[in-house]
Every structure is written in structure tokens, then in C-alpha cells.
Amino acid sequence: MITKFYKIEWREFDARCRRLARKILRDDTIKDIYGISRGGLPIAVRLSHLTRLPLTETPKSTTTVIVDDILDSGSTRESFKNFKHFEVLVNKKEEDIKEWVIFPWEKK
């Protein structure tokens, strides 16, 4: 049972979204944003506001950036392996985060 938590506050959420937005804007092939339900939806909305790119309900493999809250086991990423652009707010392996991640909109 996981008893340790890594809590992301709103300020950190916004800073992470701003970093992702800058990365997205550097790629002129990205035309819209698709948020994976449920965790990716708040991120997709924030990124849409920051980049002024529209949200989409029907992602396209080469022009849509797929966004999710966290990359842990990689199973969700595998589901979107045919998509060129895939971004997450938290990559547990790259960041060496072992705790359970709690986002600002979640209860502990």
C-alpha cells in the first residue's frame, strides 16, 4: 500500500503547463489538443488557453497533441503509440517520482 504522496499544488501545475505550452508552440505541426479523460482534461484546457490552440474531440495522428496527467506504467501511452505528439504533466520515470501523485483537483 502506498502511504507517501507527491502533492502538486496549483502553482506547480501552472508552471508545468507553461513549460508544456512553450514546447507545443515550438512545433508548428501541432494544430489542436486532445485531453485523455479524466486526468488529461484539466491540462488540455489550460494548454488550450495558454497556446490558443483549440481542443478537439477527434484527434488526428500527425497534428494533434495528446495530453495526459501522468506517465507511469506506459499503458496509456501505448494506446496512443500511432500519434506523433504525446505529452504528460508528470513523467514518473524521468522525474524519479516514486510516491503517489496527487493533483490540485483531487482529494488525498
Spans of model-derived segments:
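PRPP-associated nucleotide enzymes
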Residues: 1-108
